[in-house]
Amino acid sequence: MQESTANKVAANATSSFTEHLQRDRPELLPFNRSGQGSATAAAPLQVPHATTIVAMSYNGGVLMAGDRRATMGNVIASRHIEKVFPADRYSVLGIAGTAGIAIDLTRLFQVELEHYEKIEGTLLSLEGKANRLGAMIRGNLPLAMQGLAVVPLFAGFDTSAGVGRLFSYDVTGGRYEEHEHHTVGSGSVFARGALKKLWRPNLSAEEAVAVAIEALFDAADDDSATGGPDTVRKLWPVVYTVDSTGTRRVAEPQLAAASQHVIEARTIAGREA
């Protein structure tokens, strides 16, 4: 009996955890829970939304940063939300859109990559990770059509090519490789303007952190759904770097120092806008 069960499990084994859930427990998928896919919302749901994410390449890797504010309509739902997460040892994921679904999707993606490594005995390629994330977003399309969209930003270090790479997505799961830098979320247009002026090739990791802080400051200046560094509450953006050694979360003292430098520079300049 035990051997028969083991053989059955082996026969049904798949390197995709999402595929396994879709086949055996579809109700556990964040985009396939009972009643969600067929519901017709009469009015927009008031749920927390994550806002602005910025990412850029630097000399030897990639960086991703996100502000800490979540909004629900015209209300600040949270000042502490984290929107950038390590997907595995060599990649990070930033979320914009419906916060609850985005966080569930992030956890599923983390398990997906861990499951693949356990089954196959090797890491999935960065290209493969980007493709699998696109397939997950495509699965959320019915909810996106109801206004519960998730639009992530994915970045990682390609160990085979020895470079950092950035990928953006649309709500249909379309995957697009970006170069130099990219932004998503409600404040993205303002953050992108800052990146166009401040980014340059071969930034150091420390310089990239400073550029990301500047971009989030600019986004928070003009977008009420984006929260800039909060010096009163000592709340700083979540920032990750990824290089040949893996992912690293930038320490809060470094973020505090970079934020203070931006504030002092703008105070001296007497900037009003």
UniProtKB/Swiss-Prot annotation:
Q: In which pathway does it act?
A: Protein degradation; proteasomal Pup-dependent pathway
Q: Give residue ranges for the propeptide.
A: 1-50
Q: Name one Pfam family in it.
A: Proteasome
Example GO biological process term?
Answer: modification-dependent protein catabolic process
Recount the known activity regulation: The formation of the proteasomal ATPase ARC-20S proteasome complex, likely via the docking of the C-termini of ARC into the intersubunit pockets in the alpha-rings, may trigger opening of the gate for substrate entry. Interconversion between the open-gate and close-gate conformations leads to a dynamic regulation of the 20S proteasome proteolysis activity.
Q: Which InterPro entries would you find in this protein's record? A: Ntn_hydrolases_N, Pept_T1A_subB, Proteasome_sua/b, Proteasome_suB-type, PSB_actinobac
Keywords attached to this Swiss-Prot or TrEMBL record, sorted alphabetically, are: Autocatalytic cleavage, Cytoplasm, Hydrolase, Protease, Proteasome, Threonine protease, Zymogen
GO CC: one term? proteasome core complex, beta-subunit complex
Q: Where is the composition biased (Polar residues)?
A: 1-19
One molecular function GO term is: threonine-type endopeptidase activity
Under which EC number(s) is this enzyme classified? 3.4.25.1
- Enumerate the SUPFAM superfamilies for this protein: N-terminal nucleophile aminohydrolases (Ntn hydrolases)
Provide the catalytic activity annotation.
Cleavage of peptide bonds with very broad specificity
Active site, per annotation:
T51
**Stretch list, region Disordered:** 1-23
Spell out the family assignment given in the record's similarity comment. Belongs to the peptidase T1B family.
Subunit comment for this entry? The 20S proteasome core is composed of 14 alpha and 14 beta subunits that assemble into four stacked heptameric rings, resulting in a barrel-shaped structure. The two inner rings, each composed of seven catalytic beta subunits, are sandwiched by two outer rings, each composed of seven alpha subunits. The catalytic chamber with the active sites is on the inside of the barrel. Has a gated structure, the ends of the cylinder being occluded by the N-termini of the alpha-subunits. Is capped by the proteasome-associated ATPase, ARC.
Protein's name in the database: Proteasome subunit beta
Question: What gene does this protein come from?
Answer: prcB
